[in-house]
């Protein structure tokens, strides 16, 4: 299982371009979030929210969570091959995708609302919100680590904040759900390399045409935005796919110069585990949990591989399913303080 060698890591470099980057576009309606996202290279729109009728790029309606999981599986099973067709994956919107995930959890446990999935006893139900967050993170992380440019679209909301220095209270724009510390929306926001807050600029009085939205790229007193790169500009006056790409490339270039790091094109590094890796990783978990929670272990395996299947029956095409089993069992042990040797 020699996938990572901490004593033979490559020299630090920064990868230019938007490939492999995670972007978030936040804002109210009619600011060009979906339209400009579809103008990035080789886009695929995953439409969790109905409203893509004016978008001409390839799109898949995400009307249930299992469909999203299937798309992620196909995109990540052979991401190099998938990137010959798609380079930009657009999730529109984050909050609707979260709803699809929570709806799936409700159906699984036969309740009308996720808050009704209460008991932490595995023989009954786990905590619904925690379970949904884990499922959501697993799929979003898999998609985000596959080498695509992933664009997450979300709405914005205005919240009242207090300046910690002056004590002044004022309204500030945030991506939807960001102020809820444990929310999946906040997880996505924190995951992104760039978070852009879009604001309207009104109508040109001479032409009576709508002026392109402005993109706020770094946090201000009135709007949340962020970048992992300190050299990112504060504003993009005209929000277009080309201007966003140029701003990102310039920020990375300046950051690399300041840090004395090399600048290279994005290349996908494979740190993924194969089937045999997962067989070895799962052995101690099965040995620990099967005697204590046989029904739970059987249920987890059946949900991923099918009824009456064993871990060792998994094929090379079921590596993602083995990963899901591993994540589920390891999360279960961590949440209950179970030590696995």
Predicted regions and their residues:
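Interfaces that engage single-stranded nucleic acids at replication/repair/recombination sites
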Residues: 2-4, 16, 31, 39-40, ...
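Hydrophobic/aromatic ligand-binding patch that stacks against planar heteroaromatic rings
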Residues: 35-37, 142, 187-188
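Conserved P-loop
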Residues: 4-91, 95-100
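Surface-exposed alpha-helical segments enriched in charged/polar residues
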Residues: 70-73, 77, 138-141, 287, ...
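Conserved nucleotide-binding/hydrolysis micro-motifs of P-loop NTPases
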Residues: 49-53, 95-96, 156-160, 201-204, ...
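Short, well-ordered beta-strand core segments
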Residues: 43-45, 150, 195-197
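Conserved GTP-binding G-domain of TRAFAC-class P-loop NTPases and closely related GTPase folds
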Residues: 162-273
């Amino acid at each position: 299982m020699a996938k990572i060698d901490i004593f033979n890591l490559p020299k630090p470099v920064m990868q230019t371009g938007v490939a492999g980057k995670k972007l978030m576009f936040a804002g109210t309606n009619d600011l060009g979030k979906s339209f400009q996202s579809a103008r990035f290279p080789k886009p695929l729109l995953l439409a969790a929210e109905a409203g893509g009728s004016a978008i001409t790029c390839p799109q898949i309606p995400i009307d249930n969570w299992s469909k999203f999981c299937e798309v992620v599986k196909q995109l990540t099973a052979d991401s190099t091959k998938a990137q010959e067709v798609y380079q930009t994956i657009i999730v529109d919107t984050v909050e609707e995708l979260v709803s699809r995930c929570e709806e799936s959890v409700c159906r699984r446990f036969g309740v009308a609302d996720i808050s009704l999935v209460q008991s932490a006893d595995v023989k009954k139900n786990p905590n619904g919100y925690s379970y949904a967050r884990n499922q959501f993170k697993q799929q979003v992380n898999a998609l985000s680590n596959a080498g695509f440019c992933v664009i997450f679209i979300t709405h914005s909301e205005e919240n009242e904040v207090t300046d910690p220095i002056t004590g002044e209270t004022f309204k500030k724009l945030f991506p939807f759900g960001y102020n809820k510390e444990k929310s999946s929306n906040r997880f996505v926001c924190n995951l992104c390399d760039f978070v852009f807050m879009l604001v309207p600029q009104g109508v040109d009085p001479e032409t009576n045409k709508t002026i392109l939205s402005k993109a706020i790229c770094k946090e201000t007193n009135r709007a949340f935005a962020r970048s992992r790169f300190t050299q990112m500009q504060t504003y993009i006056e005209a929000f277009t796919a080309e201007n966003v790409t140029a701003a990102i490339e310039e920020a990375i270039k300046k950051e690399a110069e300041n840090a004395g790091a090399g600048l290279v094109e994005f290349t996908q590094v494979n740190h993924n585990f194969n089937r045999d890796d997962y067989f070895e990783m799962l052995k101690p978990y099965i040995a620990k949990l099967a005697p204590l929670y046989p029904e739970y272990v059987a249920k987890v395996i059946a949900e991923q591989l099918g009824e009456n299947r064993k871990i060792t029956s998994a094929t090379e095409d079921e590596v993602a399913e083995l990963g899901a089993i591993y994540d589920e069992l390891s999360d279960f042990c961590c949440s209950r303080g179970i030590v696995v040797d």
